[in-house]
Amino acid sequence: NYHVLLGQNNLSEDVQHRLVSQSFRHPDYKPFLMRNHTRKPKDYSNDLMLLHLSEPADITDGVKVIDLPTKEPKVGSTCLVSGWGSTNPSEWEFPDDLQCVNIHLLSNEKCIKAYKEKVTDLMLCAGELEGGKDTCRGDSGGPLICDGVLQGITSWGSVPCGEPNKPGIYTKLIKFTSWIKEVMKENP
Protein backbone atom coordinates (compact mmCIF):
# COMPACT_ATOMS: atom_id res chain seq x y z
CA ASN A 1 0.00 0.00 0.00
CA TYR A 2 1.14 3.51 -0.70
CA HIS A 3 -0.32 6.98 -0.65
CA VAL A 4 0.03 10.26 -2.49
CA LEU A 5 0.23 13.83 -1.24
CA LEU A 6 -1.70 16.28 -3.41
CA GLY A 7 -0.97 20.00 -3.69
CA GLN A 8 2.32 19.91 -1.81
CA ASN A 9 4.86 22.62 -2.69
CA ASN A 10 6.83 22.48 0.58
CA LEU A 11 7.50 19.58 2.95
CA SER A 12 6.02 21.51 5.89
CA GLU A 13 2.67 22.21 4.17
CA ASP A 14 -0.54 20.51 5.19
CA VAL A 15 -1.89 18.81 2.06
CA GLN A 16 -4.41 16.25 0.88
CA HIS A 17 -3.43 12.65 1.63
CA ARG A 18 -4.95 9.89 -0.48
CA LEU A 19 -4.39 6.15 -0.36
CA VAL A 20 -3.80 4.45 -3.68
CA SER A 21 -6.35 1.65 -4.04
CA GLN A 22 -5.01 0.29 -7.33
CA SER A 23 -2.20 0.89 -9.80
CA PHE A 24 -2.14 0.14 -13.52
CA ARG A 25 1.28 -0.29 -15.13
CA HIS A 26 1.19 -0.08 -18.91
CA PRO A 27 1.11 -3.72 -20.12
CA ASP A 28 3.90 -3.16 -22.67
CA TYR A 29 6.44 -1.67 -20.24
CA LYS A 30 9.46 -4.00 -20.37
CA PRO A 31 12.63 -2.10 -19.45
CA PHE A 32 15.07 -5.03 -19.43
CA LEU A 33 15.39 -7.08 -22.59
CA MET A 34 17.61 -10.16 -22.56
CA ARG A 35 18.54 -12.28 -25.55
CA ASN A 36 20.93 -15.22 -25.28
CA HIS A 37 21.80 -14.09 -21.73
CA THR A 38 23.03 -10.75 -23.09
CA ARG A 39 21.48 -7.47 -22.03
CA LYS A 40 20.31 -5.47 -25.02
CA PRO A 41 20.05 -1.69 -24.94
CA LYS A 42 17.36 -0.72 -22.48
CA ASP A 43 14.05 0.28 -23.95
CA TYR A 44 11.95 2.32 -21.55
CA SER A 45 9.02 2.69 -23.97
CA ASN A 46 5.58 2.63 -22.34
CA ASP A 47 6.96 3.97 -19.03
CA LEU A 48 3.59 4.85 -17.57
CA MET A 49 1.52 3.87 -14.54
CA LEU A 50 -1.90 5.14 -13.54
CA LEU A 51 -2.97 5.36 -9.89
CA HIS A 52 -6.55 4.96 -8.69
CA LEU A 53 -7.11 6.92 -5.49
CA SER A 54 -9.23 5.49 -2.68
CA GLU A 55 -11.25 8.71 -2.67
CA PRO A 56 -11.44 11.63 -5.10
CA ALA A 57 -9.14 14.61 -4.73
CA ASP A 58 -10.63 17.90 -3.58
CA ILE A 59 -10.15 20.47 -6.35
CA THR A 60 -8.54 23.57 -4.78
CA ASP A 61 -6.13 26.38 -5.71
CA GLY A 62 -3.28 23.88 -5.20
CA VAL A 63 -4.92 20.78 -6.71
CA LYS A 64 -6.28 21.16 -10.22
CA VAL A 65 -7.28 19.04 -13.19
CA ILE A 66 -4.91 19.22 -16.17
CA ASP A 67 -5.76 18.47 -19.78
CA LEU A 68 -4.41 15.44 -21.59
CA PRO A 69 -2.96 16.15 -25.03
CA THR A 70 -5.15 16.13 -28.12
CA LYS A 71 -2.33 16.92 -30.56
CA GLU A 72 1.41 16.46 -30.87
CA PRO A 73 3.51 18.96 -28.93
CA LYS A 74 5.60 21.35 -31.03
CA VAL A 75 9.39 21.10 -31.05
CA GLY A 76 10.73 24.35 -29.58
CA SER A 77 7.86 24.72 -27.10
CA THR A 78 8.76 25.92 -23.62
CA CYS A 79 7.64 23.33 -21.09
CA LEU A 80 7.55 23.26 -17.30
CA VAL A 81 8.91 20.27 -15.39
CA SER A 82 8.74 19.79 -11.65
CA GLY A 83 9.76 17.25 -9.06
CA TRP A 84 11.09 16.34 -5.65
CA GLY A 85 14.22 14.62 -7.00
CA SER A 86 17.86 15.32 -6.25
CA THR A 87 19.08 18.91 -6.62
CA ASN A 88 22.69 17.73 -6.90
CA PRO A 89 23.61 16.18 -10.27
CA SER A 90 26.09 13.72 -8.71
CA GLU A 91 24.72 12.93 -5.24
CA TRP A 92 21.35 12.33 -3.57
CA GLU A 93 20.31 15.70 -2.12
CA PHE A 94 16.60 16.33 -1.77
CA PRO A 95 14.85 19.71 -1.51
CA ASP A 96 12.33 20.98 1.04
CA ASP A 97 10.49 22.80 -1.77
CA LEU A 98 9.08 21.44 -5.03
CA GLN A 99 11.56 22.27 -7.79
CA CYS A 100 10.31 23.67 -11.13
CA VAL A 101 12.18 24.71 -14.26
CA ASN A 102 11.31 25.67 -17.84
CA ILE A 103 12.99 23.62 -20.56
CA HIS A 104 12.51 23.31 -24.32
CA LEU A 105 11.02 20.48 -26.31
CA LEU A 106 13.68 19.16 -28.70
CA SER A 107 13.56 16.81 -31.67
CA ASN A 108 13.99 13.15 -30.73
CA GLU A 109 17.05 13.09 -33.01
CA LYS A 110 18.92 15.15 -30.36
CA CYS A 111 18.29 12.41 -27.79
CA ILE A 112 18.96 9.56 -30.23
CA LYS A 113 22.45 11.02 -30.75
CA ALA A 114 22.98 11.47 -27.00
CA TYR A 115 22.10 7.99 -25.68
CA LYS A 116 22.83 4.32 -26.36
CA GLU A 117 19.46 3.42 -24.81
CA LYS A 118 16.57 3.34 -27.24
CA VAL A 119 14.73 6.61 -27.88
CA THR A 120 11.43 5.76 -29.57
CA ASP A 121 8.43 7.60 -30.97
CA LEU A 122 6.69 6.87 -27.64
CA MET A 123 9.07 9.36 -26.00
CA LEU A 124 9.73 13.10 -25.95
CA CYS A 125 13.15 14.73 -25.76
CA ALA A 126 13.35 17.93 -23.69
CA GLY A 127 15.99 20.02 -21.97
CA GLU A 128 18.67 22.58 -22.67
CA LEU A 129 21.61 21.50 -24.85
CA GLU A 130 23.96 23.77 -22.89
CA GLY A 131 23.01 21.79 -19.76
CA GLY A 132 22.15 23.00 -16.28
CA LYS A 133 18.34 22.65 -16.52
CA ASP A 134 17.00 19.13 -16.23
CA THR A 135 15.00 16.66 -14.21
CA CYS A 136 17.13 14.40 -12.04
CA ARG A 137 17.16 11.16 -10.02
CA GLY A 138 13.94 10.95 -8.04
CA ASP A 139 11.90 13.10 -10.45
CA SER A 140 10.54 10.15 -12.46
CA GLY A 141 6.77 10.24 -12.79
CA GLY A 142 6.64 14.03 -12.65
CA PRO A 143 4.90 16.23 -15.23
CA LEU A 144 6.12 17.82 -18.47
CA ILE A 145 3.58 20.60 -19.07
CA CYS A 146 3.63 22.46 -22.39
CA ASP A 147 1.14 25.28 -23.02
CA GLY A 148 -0.97 24.17 -20.04
CA VAL A 149 -1.28 20.58 -21.31
CA LEU A 150 0.28 17.48 -19.72
CA GLN A 151 2.38 16.32 -22.68
CA GLY A 152 4.84 14.05 -20.91
CA ILE A 153 5.90 12.18 -17.80
CA THR A 154 9.52 12.25 -16.59
CA SER A 155 11.07 8.90 -17.53
CA TRP A 156 14.89 8.85 -17.71
CA GLY A 157 18.03 10.76 -18.63
CA SER A 158 21.73 11.13 -17.97
CA VAL A 159 23.50 10.44 -14.69
CA PRO A 160 24.71 12.90 -13.60
CA CYS A 161 21.75 14.99 -14.69
CA GLY A 162 21.97 18.42 -16.31
CA GLU A 163 24.89 17.51 -18.55
CA PRO A 164 25.40 19.42 -21.83
CA ASN A 165 23.95 17.63 -24.88
CA LYS A 166 22.11 15.11 -22.65
CA PRO A 167 18.44 16.19 -22.55
CA GLY A 168 15.84 14.32 -20.51
CA ILE A 169 13.46 11.69 -21.84
CA TYR A 170 9.73 11.85 -21.16
CA THR A 171 6.88 9.43 -21.87
CA LYS A 172 4.88 10.95 -24.76
CA LEU A 173 1.30 11.03 -23.47
CA ILE A 174 -0.41 11.69 -26.83
CA LYS A 175 0.52 8.08 -27.66
CA PHE A 176 -1.30 6.78 -24.57
CA THR A 177 -4.50 8.83 -24.29
CA SER A 178 -6.70 5.96 -25.55
CA TRP A 179 -5.19 3.56 -23.00
CA ILE A 180 -5.53 6.15 -20.19
CA LYS A 181 -9.20 6.79 -21.03
CA GLU A 182 -9.92 3.06 -21.30
CA VAL A 183 -8.37 2.33 -17.86
CA MET A 184 -10.27 5.25 -16.32
CA LYS A 185 -13.56 4.11 -17.86
CA GLU A 186 -13.13 0.52 -16.66
CA ASN A 187 -12.13 1.62 -13.14
CA PRO A 188 -14.39 4.53 -12.12
UniProtKB/Swiss-Prot annotation:
InterPro entries: Peptidase_S1_PA, Peptidase_S1_PA_chymotrypsin, Peptidase_S1A, Trypsin_dom, TRYPSIN_SER. Its EC number is 3.4.21.35. It catalyses: Preferential cleavage of Arg-|-Xaa bonds in small molecule substrates. Highly selective action to release kallidin (lysyl-bradykinin) from kininogen involves hydrolysis of Met-|-Xaa or Leu-|-Xaa. It is an enzyme of class 3 (hydrolase). GO terms for molecular function: serine-type endopeptidase activity. Transmembrane segments: none annotated. Disulfide bonds join 79-146, 111-125, 136-161. Pfam families: Trypsin. Glandular kallikreins cleave Met-Lys and Arg-Ser bonds in kininogen to release Lys-bradykinin. The active site is at residues 47, 140. Belongs to the peptidase S1 family. Kallikrein subfamily. Keywords: Disulfide bond, Glycoprotein, Hydrolase, Protease, Serine protease. One of its GO terms (biological process) is regulation of systemic arterial blood pressure. SUPFAM superfamilies: Trypsin-like serine proteases. This is Glandular kallikrein-3, submandibular. Residues 1-185 form the Peptidase S1 domain. Glycans are attached at residues 10, 36. GO terms for cellular component: extracellular space; secretory granule. The gene is Klk3.
